[in-house]
Amino acid sequence: YQKKDPVADRLPWTQHQTLGIYDAVDYALNAANVPVVTYGGELDPQLLASTTMQKLTGELQVPLQVLIGAGMGHEFDADSRRRFMEFHLEKSLVGRPQSGQRKKLRFSTRTLRYSRCDWLRVEEQLVCYQPATVEGEIDDMDTLRLTTQNAALLRLSREIAGTVVIDGSELELRGAAEGLLPDVWFQRQADGAWTVLGYQESRAISRNPDLRKRPGLQGPIDDAFMGSFLCVRGTGVPLHPAAGGWSERVLQQFREEFAKWFRGEVRVVSDQDLTEQMIAEHHLILFGDPGSNSVLARVLPMLHGQPVEWNAERIRVGQREWSAAEHGLVLIHPNPLNRAKYVVLNSGHTFHERDFRASNAWLFPRLGDAAVLRLSAEAENAESAVQWSGVFDSGWKLSTE
């Protein structure tokens, strides 16, 4: 209903990848796990959202009921409202299945932010921001049979079945890991076969020693603002005056937009006032460059992925380089000072005033996991031109393209 041509108006590659995080069409399969009814007025352009989902779920053999109000615009008619509420009342009286009662599951996600469905959790994807799908059913022999796509690491509640068959690999479930953990971990091997992890292996992998993308620590940049965050402003001398002015404008824009659209106050401290407790409790949003922000200068050489360099001459990300006098760096990464939290450089939300005003359909990530922006003192509302943007893989590394 936004009237965008899927070819002519196609988004830049990075935006197109992360758009799927919030695009409902990529989650149609999940309607198999919960009763769904939707409504649209016959004359409402947004009825297209309902009918599109009905078409997609139909192709997947998933039930989805659509109520259409005859002659109505963007509002209910009395009969449709009654039927809509009766549907929800009936289903709420039944409630969701209790633990262990669900025998069949069909689940898909584009992001580890939304990784759990009942007794299943997708802990890693093979390819980030692409659909990871798990479908399965518990048979009469107490065996859970699963098929997967784009999943690299799974957790299953142990009590649901005695054994599990994942993509043809038959493995112990209820008695796995010596029966000492509530969930059992399963890892995909390079040849596509799956293995079950023992007690010590499970404890180790749950700590994420190799710093993989995991639920709640998977990007993109905007994901950092779904938890407690703290902005850290530099107090030193920037490598270039333009970089200092740019980072201040970005911070000011974030504060103003957050106050207006989220009705909250962005917390800001100086790099000299940052404490260990703050590092432990918050995602850190660092503004400045290695000259002006001592915290940024400290964490930059410690990033886990491909080398990131920022000095007075250049910004280098992997094999790519830009002039530091004319460009600024934006990225998200696990914080080397607290690997359970994010660190973000020079960015608030990557959507802005015009997107808030347009529609909530426009509030999707614009810069992926990392970007280099051209500094521009003339850019309205501190916006800068994107010279490059990209996404990290499951190991927080960039491709070598």
Where are the regions that the model predicts?
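Solvent-exposed alpha-helical segments and adjacent loops
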Residues: 145, 156-401
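Extracellular beta-sheet-rich ligand-binding/adhesion modules
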Residues: 140, 149-157
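Mobile cap/lid helix-loop segments that gate and shape the active-site cleft of serine hydrolases
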Residues: 1-29, 33-34
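Structured segments of extracytoplasmic/periplasmic soluble domains
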Residues: 30, 34, 56-60, 87-95, ...
